[in-house]
């Protein structure tokens, strides 16, 4: 008999991915979500929120490098960045690798997740919370965006999936992206769920952002712990990361990144934006828009 328990993550109402849990490190029900920190048999230490794996020690670098670097390397000398979500601190870690960064504000709604990260996820944040360039704000992201008078060079949106009636759901709407655009000089990037398990959700997020920004591109990559492709949407009125060549990206990494990258380089950049035809066709044909009245949601 196997001496472990199982974490069952539902991808759709009729499909799940099972992970063997060898150890429960910490667990807490917060006012916003159920937070669980575990050791998985295959992927090691992992953060799970509301039944969804957020990242694991084995492959978190794939997701976080893909989220951050295509946008920040495409803009000129980013200095002031806003992160929404990103409780593990790994998104903050990647932003701080850019030599031109002067300050980063990270806004997360749940202090329990931040405490989890500071105490247990040192491999993720690598001291980023204590960097003098970092500022942590515990607040609802939508509220912060509407009330702030600050302007940022770019906004990195690293939220949980738009689960129905969750705190994150309204942060995938046209109204929200319009508010984010108001405070962003160069543009935004958001995680956009999985084209493998929720292609309609991915395409609606993409189409919604297309109705707010002039230049919008979708990127994808495979994340093993998620058991499928993961999608990102990059948006700006000024630049399009998808238009940069392999050589341009490699040169910018050499000039502008302080520290090593394990996943992302010029060749990976080209691969991320080389989206299969069937997914491109869905993106091109999508006509639904996520609004506060009718917000998009993942199927499970």
Swiss-Prot record:
Molecular function GO terms recorded: spermidine synthase activity; thermospermine synthase activity
**Annotated positions binding spermidine:** 64, 88
Which positions carry the signal peptide feature in this UniProt record?
A: none
List residues binding S-methyl-5'-thioadenosine: 33, 108, 140-141, 167
Q: Say which family it is in.
A: Belongs to the spermidine/spermine synthase family.
Quote the NCBIfam families the UniProt record gives.
Answer: PRK00811.1
- What name does the UniProt record give this protein? Polyamine aminopropyltransferase
User: Could you tell me which species this protein originates from?
Assistant: Sulfurisphaera tokodaii (strain DSM 16993 / JCM 10545 / NBRC 100140 / 7) (Sulfolobus tokodaii)
Identify the coding gene. Answer: speE
């Amino acid at each position: 008999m196997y001496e472990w328990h199982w974490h069952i993550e539902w991808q759709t109402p009729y499909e799940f991915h099972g992970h063997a849990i060898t150890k429960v490190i910490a667990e807490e029900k917060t006012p916003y979500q159920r937070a669980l920190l575990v050791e998985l048999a295959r992927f090691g230490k992992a953060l799970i929120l509301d039944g969804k794996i957020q990242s694991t020690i084995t492959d978190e670098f794939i997701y976080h490098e893909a989220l951050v670097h295509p946008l920040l390397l495409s803009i000129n000398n980013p200095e002031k960045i806003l992160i929404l979500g990103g409780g593990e601190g790994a998104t903050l870690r990647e932003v701080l690798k850019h030599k031109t960064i002067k300050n980063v504000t990270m806004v997360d709604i749940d202090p329990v997740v931040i405490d989890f990260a500071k105490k247990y996820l040192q491999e993720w944040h690598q001291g980023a919370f204590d960097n003098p360039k970092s500022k942590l704000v515990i607040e609802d992201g939508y509220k912060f965006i509407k009330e702030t008078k600050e302007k940022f060079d770019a906004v990195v949106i690293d939220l949980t999936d738009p689960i129905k009636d969750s705190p994150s759901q309204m942060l995938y709407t046209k109204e929200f992206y319009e508010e984010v655009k108001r405070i962003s000089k160069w543009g935004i990037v958001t995680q956009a769920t999985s084209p493998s398990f929720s292609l309609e959700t991915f395409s609606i997020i993409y189409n919604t952002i297309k109705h707010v920004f002039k230049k919008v591109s979708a990127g994808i990559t495979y994340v093993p712990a998620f058991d499928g492709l993961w999608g990102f949407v990059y948006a700006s009125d000024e630049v399009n990361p998808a238009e940069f060549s392999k050589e341009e990206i490699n040169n910018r990494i050499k000039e502008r990144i302080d520290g090593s990258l394990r996943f992302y380089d010029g060749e990976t950049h080209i691969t991320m934006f080389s989206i299969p035809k069937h997914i491109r066709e869905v993106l091109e044909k999508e006509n639904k828009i996520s609004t506060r009245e009718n917000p998009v949601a993942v199927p499970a």
